[in-house]
UniProtKB/Swiss-Prot annotation:
Its EC number is 2.8.1.13. It is an enzyme of class 2 (transferase). InterPro entries: MnmA-like (IPR004506), MnmA-like_C (IPR046885), MnmA-like_central (IPR046884), MnmA-like_central_sf (IPR023382), Rossmann-like_a/b/a_fold (IPR014729). The record marks H130, Q344 as: Interaction with tRNA. GO terms for biological process: tRNA wobble position uridine thiolation. Residues 151-153, 312-313 are annotated as: Interaction with tRNA. GO terms for cellular component: cytoplasm. It comes from the Bacteria. Keywords: ATP-binding, Cytoplasm, Disulfide bond, Nucleotide-binding, RNA-binding, Transferase, tRNA processing, tRNA-binding. The gene is mnmA. One of its GO terms (molecular function) is tRNA-uridine 2-sulfurtransferase activity. Catalyzes the 2-thiolation of uridine at the wobble position (U34) of tRNA, leading to the formation of s(2)U34. This is tRNA-specific 2-thiouridylase MnmA. PANTHER family: MITOCHONDRIAL TRNA-SPECIFIC 2-THIOURIDYLASE 1, TRNA 5-METHYLAMINOMETHYL-2-THIOURIDYLATE -METHYLTRANSFERASE.
Amino acid sequence: MKKGRVLVAMSGGIDSSITALLLHEQGYEIVGLTMKTWDYVSSGGRKKETGCCSLDSINDARNVAVSLGFPHIILDIREEFGDYVISNFTSEYLAGRTPNPCVLCNTHIKWDALLRRADKLNCEYIATGHYANIRHENGRYIVSRGKDLNKDQSYALWGVSQESLSRTLLPLGVFTKPEIREIASQRGFKELVTKSESYEICFIPDNDYRGFLKRRVDNLEEQVKGGEFVLEDGTVVGHHEGYPFYTVGQRKGLGITLGYPVYVTEIQADKNRVVLGTFDELARDGMYVHKLNMGKYPDLQGRRLDSVTKVRYNDPGSPAVLEQDGDIMKVFFGKGVHAIAPGQAAVFYEGDDVIGGGWIKASFKQPAFKKYNFSQ
């Protein structure tokens, strides 16, 4: 007896393919779906044979579906993707922030598009190949880290709504990547094991985001040229190529030599300035996070909550105290955290559970020990 009908997001890679395989073996009725989000070549890239949205990847997903005997469809969301994700990407850089398009796409494009199509196809559930887990507890759907901490993708799912989580299956969360490769080999999908994985942003040709911005924004270089590199005290030490071409924490590619290592510590878009400093000057003691989506706990108003907070995808996280003030989360770190970039996602953890997350609005220097005693 079938457990239910599931719409599986399939990129053609090993993770989403084995997601479909596992659910098929568990007795679900599967419909595979591949999203076309962007035309890589039209955005200035060389012909791309592999990776997200390529013809080869679509064919790979279809071949898995045919092999397992379930239907496969293609969903073209390029217009929606461009209107929301691409527009946000350019506007964030023009505002001096560093966007995270993959998290934004998960939250506002992919899940919504999957659920809308699932409804049309009478699918009770959707599924993806993320390495994370979801459980239902105390009336809440809680995202938690996957078994494979090296591949854990819970950070990317902080923005998915409770309603969406209630219909989401993540079968890879209880496996490690080597285990998934072994399953693929055992089930006759050895070609998936050797297929290269794409880690680039799907719409950035050859990882050249500067070139992408120049093509997307008319007269960008004219708008932002002639800006100043300054030190933390305001001393002008050089001229930069345009503030949108830099990000907080950047050291390489600055085109300036001061006799000691310097990093971008702040971007002042309104002044067309890029602030440079030492590694120590890059540290911040806290930050303000807005546009929150709370998971494990719906509201932290009036509470002080200990957490481990991540400020970027590959960040192991730092001990922090959370204080919610309306729609702003104040985050106080026990020790200085480096390269907190406005525009990136901040995700709050309690153990392996995602408490919630939001977008970094600003960071500040205010030693947390003046307010809290952190046990280290």
